[in-house]
């Protein structure tokens, strides 16, 4: 919430409302903390049932903020309470719409997130979403700007654009949900076929956003706990505790604490913590570079992981200097892989099925990282692992190492660099 508070201070402005588009599944939104610090009212659309004080607005209810207004437009489908907010300027002209997870750029919000906890089928929700987009958003002026809740990389959609704002006019041309290229039945099929597996922490985050969550100041005070080597080792022996190494992947592979999980701060950190660690109540011990302790705890808390026991004081260096056991991951350049690709080697591709449709290595095994099922793998075999750029493959290597796989090679640079050396790609 710091960005909002800084802007408010900069412009000497009062935060009057906190407009929520829905109960978010992929992060803890910070609405209660912001409300407590500013006195602002939290606003949801119809069907929302928060367990704290909030305004449950009606469809088309108007909120005045100075000389502008925001109109709540109920646009269910992603979830049943999903709403968008249409902003009108000082002249009363439609200016932009904040669509949350209803409409993305080039895509729409997938419906399966909601049906996991609302008891409604994904097909029903997809049909409701079709009606919301065509009856509520499509009739609006093409001149308005569309500000979605996510860009590319979010698990709340299938194939979003990387841009963060566009005109509705352009989206009516290129977005399949708006350009008339699909009937309602075809839209439902397109949206519900091959849905990505949502991270297991999503329902927990929905619950936190709906019921309430721990105050971050308290979480930070408890978690910012420097641990001696002996205390760190003692705590790490508990079965319900994981060691999370958040350093750069190229540093991690050269040496790390055996059994630790790599999820680097420089990548899609929070969503992958949720996908890999899964249970938000898991006790976490952190290994990080100096001065990154607060950032690590903050970003963990944003997805509901508030149970950090502390961090290794002086980082991995103190482990290394104490002559403790160290593990590592071997790497191989795509150019060197080219020399052995035709021999009998086992390749694991941890990218999504959608990514593989754009190109894949022949005979590679697909085990997407967001559903990392290793039951078919043999611990004594050698595996060569890649993703798109190297971040996810290193996460996969750390997970396999933790399970007892010893002969692993991370393919440096991932599929992006594989393409550069003219390997045979299907």
Describe the residue ranges of each PLM region:
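Core dinuclear metal-dependent hydrolase active-site scaffold
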Residues: 62-92, 96-97, 221, 225, ...
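Histidine-centered catalytic micro-motifs
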Residues: 18-28, 75-82, 146-154, 388-391
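Active-site HxH/HxHxD metal-binding segment of metal-dependent hydrolases
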Residues: 1-74, 93-95, 279
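Rhodanese-like catalytic fold shared by cysteine-dependent sulfurtransferases
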Residues: 110-112, 123, 170-207, 211, ...
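Active-site metal-binding loops of divalent metal-dependent hydrolases
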Residues: 1, 23, 47, 79, ...
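Short, well-ordered beta-to-alpha junction loops that form the rim of enzyme active sites
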Residues: 147-152, 158-159, 204-206, 245-248, ...
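Hydrophobic "anchor" residues on beta-strands that sit immediately upstream
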Residues: 16, 97, 241, 345
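Metallo-beta-lactamase
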Residues: 79-197
């Amino acid at each position: 919430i710091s960005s909002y508070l800084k802007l408010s201070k900069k412009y000497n402005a009062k935060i009057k409302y906190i407009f929520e588009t829905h109960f978010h599944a992929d992060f803890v939104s910070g609405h209660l903390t912001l409300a407590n610090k500013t006195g602002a009212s939290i606003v949801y659309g119809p069907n929302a049932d928060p367990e704290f004080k909030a305004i449950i607005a009606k469809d088309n209810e108007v909120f005045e903020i100075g000389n502008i207004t925001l109109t709540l437009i109920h646009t269910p489908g992603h979830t049943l309470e999903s709403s968008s907010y249409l902003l009108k300027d000082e002249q009363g002209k439609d200016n932009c719409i904040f669509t949350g997870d209803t409409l993305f750029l080039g895509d729409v919000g997938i419906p399966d997130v909601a049906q996991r906890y609302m008891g409604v089928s994904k097909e029903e929700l997809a049909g409701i979403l079709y009606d919301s987009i065509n009856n509520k958003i499509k009739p609006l002026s093409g001149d308005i700007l569309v500000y979605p809740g996510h860009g590319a990389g979010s698990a709340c959609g299938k194939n979003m654009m990387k841009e963060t704002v566009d005109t509705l006019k352009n989206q009516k041309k290129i977005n399949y949900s708006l350009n008339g290229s699909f009937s309602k039945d075809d839209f439902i099929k397109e949206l519900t076929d091959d849905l990505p597996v949502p991270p297991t922490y999503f329902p927990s985050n929905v619950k936190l956003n709906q019921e309430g969550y721990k105050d971050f100041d308290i979480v930070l005070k408890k978690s910012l706990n420097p641990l001696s080597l002996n205390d760190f080792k003692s705590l790490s022996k508990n079965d319900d505790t994981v060691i999370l190494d958040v350093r750069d992947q190229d540093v991690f592979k050269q040496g790390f604490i055996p059994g630790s999980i790599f999820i680097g701060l420089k990548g899609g950190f929070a969503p992958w913590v949720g996908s890999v660690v899964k249970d938000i109540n898991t006790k976490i011990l952190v290994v990080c570079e100096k001065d990154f302790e607060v950032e690590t705890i903050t970003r963990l808390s944003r997805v509901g992981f508030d149970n950090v026991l502390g961090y290794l004081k002086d980082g991995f260096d103190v482990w290394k200097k104490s002559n403790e056991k160290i593990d590592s991951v071997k790497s191989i350049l795509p150019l060197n892989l080219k020399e052995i690709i035709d021999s009998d080697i086992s390749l694991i591709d941890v990218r999504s099925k959608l990514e593989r449709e754009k190109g894949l290595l022949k005979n590679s095994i697909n085990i997407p990282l967001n559903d990392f099922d290793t039951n078919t793998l043999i611990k004594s075999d050698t595996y060569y692992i890649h993703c798109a750029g190297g971040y996810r493959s290193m996460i996969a290597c750390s997970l396999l190492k933790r399970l007892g796989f010893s002969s692993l090679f991370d393919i440096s640079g991932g599929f992006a660099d594989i393409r550069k050396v003219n390997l045979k790609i299907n």
